[in-house]
């Protein structure tokens, strides 16, 4: 990939951002950039979206960012078939023994509604990617399937890449300000950049087998699980429903290091393995597809190299247990997209892009460890955990999915000693944490505070204070002075309020700021800063100027 990109005779195609890779993370990057008005091109070597049902667990934070991007409802429609499936079951077979529920419900007490307007969604990758693709195209994304990156070079002003159509063989030179590599765990972009990885490496190998069985639903009964770990030592595996009727996925352990070739997984052997695992010798099984895969625990040693950024599996690999992998990648893309938009739009400095690594890499390091610990706990087929893995920190799944924090980066006032994943889920307005969810009324419209955060930084200030307009007026002046698209809302119950909290909620207390205080929230919904003590009216403008210029790396 080191061939020179400025080949004579090529027409140069210019875009601000080139996205390499068009799976979940690449398509999500396209959607997020499109929402922010950033012109871009996405290239994907495969002919279309995924055809294999994998990567199905979309956690609540992922659904929040899809909500902000206007795509949540389309995803839920695509996921309607499995909307009633909950929990993780472990059992020796589906006959006789009811089994043990390792996790009966992600939100058994309904307490998640206190923290989020969204919820988990079980949508397989082959159903999710077409929704993202349609949305990306509607937003103006230039999506090129059957197109691969041949080479790229970067200089202080941008990236020059050569892409090749796998259909026509035609080469095109692309000149971009930035390149986002969402090109998978074997990332050629990462390899060319010479970026190493940390972590123990490969954890286990499986073969994913899709099959049809009309009778299997009889033995599953009303146990509508997300996944069932079948623990027959002679034929273990993980069973997942596709439609709860006749289409299923079975993950069988594969031991390539034991010289067991992939060719051993014939249709006949796979069908026999499934029958023994389920406990029904005469079960009807029609194999429809097979795909090998491996789980690993690796994190890239850096996420940025000049004008190139790693996202998704190119940046980190983790065990699928807990459904953290694709979710972490999608949230990488969400973190990066607004920063690229800000720098390209001229309202943030280049230093803001350095915070992508500072924020997202510690999250991946913490999450990969917890994913491996969950694989050990759930005895994932084929996983022989290294010593000490099962004793690693896990935390509640919501703490990992929703409660993670950025102790450093584009935040001001965060405690650098704060663990990335907290012991308890609070979301109480701490800088570096996802901003609190509160229901508000705006001119008769009901909305979550999270619905306010996408296209610009947002300042929330107290409309019921002694000087209710001080923060707001300072924000308006600074937006013009600094050319920052800062949006300001006065929150309270007075006549001048822009937003009114529901149910007598004390919004300042929920955000951890005093009466008369203010909170700055980033476009990705994370708290950038909050006032910790009362600020005199005449000090609001210099205070806010310092916050904005620091967070956005201006000046």
From Swiss-Prot:
Keywords assigned by UniProt, alphabetized: FAD, Flavoprotein, Oxidoreductase
Binding site for FAD: 16-45, 303-313
Keyword set includes Oxidoreductase: yes
Enzyme class: oxidoreductase
Molecular functions (GO terms): FAD binding; oxidoreductase activity, acting on paired donors, with incorporation or reduction of molecular oxygen, NAD(P)H as one donor, and incorporation of one atom of oxygen
Signal peptide range: none
EC number(s) reported in the record: 1.14.13.-
Annotated disulfide bonds: none
Domain of life: Bacteria
UniProt xrefs under SUPFAM superfamilies: FAD/NAD(P)-binding domain (SSF51905)
Cofactor(s) required, per the database record: FAD
Presence of keyword ATP-binding: no
Disordered: annotated segments: 366-395
Cited Pfam families: FAD_binding_3 (PF01494), Rng_hyd_C (PF21274)
Family: Belongs to the PheA/TfdB FAD monooxygenase family.
Function (record text): Involved in developmentally regulated synthesis of a compound biosynthetically related to polyketide antibiotics which is essential for spore color in Streptomyces halstedii.
Protein name per UniProt: Putative polyketide hydroxylase
Organism from which the protein derives: Streptomyces halstedii
């Amino acid at each position: 990939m080191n061939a020179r990109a400025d080949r004579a005779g090529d027409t140069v195609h210019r875009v601000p951002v080139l996205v390499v890779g068009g799976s979940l993370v690449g398509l999500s990057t396209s959607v997020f950039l499109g929402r922010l008005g950033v012109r871009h091109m996405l290239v994907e070597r495969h002919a279309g979206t995924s055809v294999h049902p994998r990567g199905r667990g979309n956690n609540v934070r992922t659904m929040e960012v899809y909500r902000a991007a206007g795509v949540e409802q389309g995803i839920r429609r695509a996921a309607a078939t499995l909307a009633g499936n909950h929990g993780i079951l472990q059992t020796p077979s589906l006959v006789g023994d009811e089994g043990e529920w390792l996790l009966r419900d992600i939100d058994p007490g309904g307490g998640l509604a206190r923290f989020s307007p969204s919820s988990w969604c079980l949508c397989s990758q082959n159903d999710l990617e077409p929704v993202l693709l349609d949305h990306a195209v509607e937003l103006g994304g230039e999506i090129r399937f059957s197109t691969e990156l041949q080479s790229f070079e970067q200089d202080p002003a941008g990236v020059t890449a050569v892409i090749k159509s796998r259909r026509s063989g035609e080469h095109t030179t692309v000149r971009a300000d930035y390149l986002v590599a969402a090109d998978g765990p074997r990332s050629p972009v990462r390899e060319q950049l010479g970026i190493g990885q940390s972590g123990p490496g490969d954890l286990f190998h499986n073969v994913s087998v899709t099959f049809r069985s009309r009778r299997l639903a009889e033995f599953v009964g009303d146990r509508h699980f997300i996944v069932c770990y079948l623990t027959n030592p002679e034929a273990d595996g993980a069973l997942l429903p596709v439609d709860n009727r006749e289409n299923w996925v079975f993950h069988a352990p594969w031991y390539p290091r034991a010289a067991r070739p992939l060719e051993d997984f014939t249709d006949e052997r796979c069908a026999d393995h499934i029958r023994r695992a389920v406990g029904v010798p005469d079960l009807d099984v029609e194999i429809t597809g097979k795909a090998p895969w491996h789980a690993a625990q690796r994190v890239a040693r850096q996420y940025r190299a000049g004008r190139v950024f790693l996202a998704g599996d190119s940046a980190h690999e983790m065990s699928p247990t807990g459904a953290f992998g694709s979710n972490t990648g999608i949230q990488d893309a969400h973190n990066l997209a607004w920063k690229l938009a800000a720098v390209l739009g001229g309202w943030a400095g280049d230093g803001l892009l350095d915070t992508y690594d500072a924020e997202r890499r510690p999250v991946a390091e913490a999450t990969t460890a917890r994913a491996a610990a969950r694989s050990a706990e759930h005895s994932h087929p084929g996983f022989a955990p290294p010593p000490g893995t099962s004793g690693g920190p896990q935390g509640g799944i919501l703490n990992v999915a929703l409660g993670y924090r950025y102790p450093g980066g584009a935040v001001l006032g965060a405690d650098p000693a704060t663990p990335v994943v907290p012991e308890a889920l609070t979301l109480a307005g701490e800088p570096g944490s996802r901003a609190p969810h509160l229901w508000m009324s705006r001119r008769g419209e009901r909305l979550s505070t999270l619905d306010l955060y996408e296209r610009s930084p947002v300042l929330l200030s107290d409309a019921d204070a002694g000087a209710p307009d001080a923060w707001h007026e300072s924000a308006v002046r600074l937006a013009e002075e600094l050319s920052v698209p800062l949006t300001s809302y006065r929150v309270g119950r007075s006549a001048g309020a822009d937003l009114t909290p529901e149910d007598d909620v004390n919004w300042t207390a929920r955000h951890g700021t005093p009466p008369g205080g203010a909170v700055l929230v980033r476009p990705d919904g994370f708290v950038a800063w909050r006032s910790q003590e009362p600020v005199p009216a005449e000090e609001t403008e210099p205070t806010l100027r310092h916050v904005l210029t620091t967070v956005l790396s201006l000046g």
